[in-house]
Amino acid sequence: MRILVTGGAGFIGSALVRYLVSINAEVLNVDKLTYAGNLASLKPVEGLRNYRFLRADICDRVAINEAFETFQPDYVIHLAAESHVDRSITGADDFVQTNVNGTFTMLETARQYWSNLSQNRKAFFKMLHVSTDEVYGSLGDRGQFEEVSPYDPSSPYSASKAASDHFATAWQRTYGLPVVISNCSNNYGPFHFPEKLIPLMILNALDRKPLPVYGTGSNIRDWLYVDDHARALWLIVREGRPGEKYNVGGRNELRNIDVVNRICLLLDELSPNASHYGDLITFVKDRPGHDARYAIDATKLETELGWKAQENFDTGIRKTVEWYLENGWWWQPLRDKVYSGERLGLLEKA
């Protein structure tokens, strides 16, 4: 089984690659290695016979075509994307280039590759386009996003992902390319680049820096442990029906302030300090266009394909905090040289 994974040096991608290699799939990881791509996240699979790495930009059609022709994948799982909302506010160009144009390149290259396969291999081939619940916009106090929910993106990031979803759907409907789409809720877990909420709070707390909470901290997100997501992606690309969408969520809805408080309480327990970590919480100016609530209904994935999350938020966040406490070798170079925790996405100074 040969699987081409794009963005496999990123957070979700590296979790998927580690999982696929562990079940003896043959994996080609194609990654540009932007600031958020980190080969250190793949040390557990480095040098193994069933893992290969290709540094390439998904917008480079020549490189991507060569990857398809040389590796001859049975499945493609497309995760490569710019994903941080704050960065999209002040740097939308990169998001359009990678998330829209890059997805177009992947779809068109996959279509040409698939059309030239033998009938048996053609019937077996499938591509999974991995997306986000943010394409649906903001929910009120009730309800959950379903696969049929209308698209209503609020940020340049979510707009770029919505566009890429529409391209994937169009390539399936127009050309018959066997594409499946997944839309996930907020992921968390080990090897998470420290610009995102949970790793940023953990590492700022350990450095005794302020813990910046946007607005009042009342925005609600559904949290999905990254290894549960990796298992879901493998299941969807194998068993999902072309032309269908599958929402992937953890059924863990929490306000941002409650997430930060849980992290602080865990750090008080696992790495006690003279003062409580919660004293570092600081409320800051809200993000422009900050969606109030996301909630995923994963019933379709659970009932049709039999997926079930193994971690709830209590078990997953404990594993995550423990991992960061034990793995400074991974995150300290990032804090020192790549991103030290400064505020991103401000249109004007706070």
From Swiss-Prot:
Annotated positions binding substrate: 132
Positions annotated to bind NAD(+): 7-13
Biological processes, Gene Ontology terms: dTDP-rhamnose biosynthetic process
Biological pathway: Carbohydrate biosynthesis; dTDP-L-rhamnose biosynthesis
Reactions catalysed according to its record: dTDP-alpha-D-glucose = dTDP-4-dehydro-6-deoxy-alpha-D-glucose + H2O
One GO molecular-function entry: dTDP-glucose 4,6-dehydratase activity
Keyword field: Lyase, NAD, Plasmid
Family matches, as InterPro entries: dTDP_Gluc_deHydtase, NAD(P)-bd_dom, NAD(P)-bd_dom_sf
Cofactor dependence: NAD(+)
EC number: 4.2.1.46
Domain of life: Bacteria
Active site positions: 133-134, 157
The family this protein is said to belong to: Belongs to the NAD(P)-dependent epimerase/dehydratase family. dTDP-glucose dehydratase subfamily.
Protein's UniProt name: Probable dTDP-glucose 4,6-dehydratase
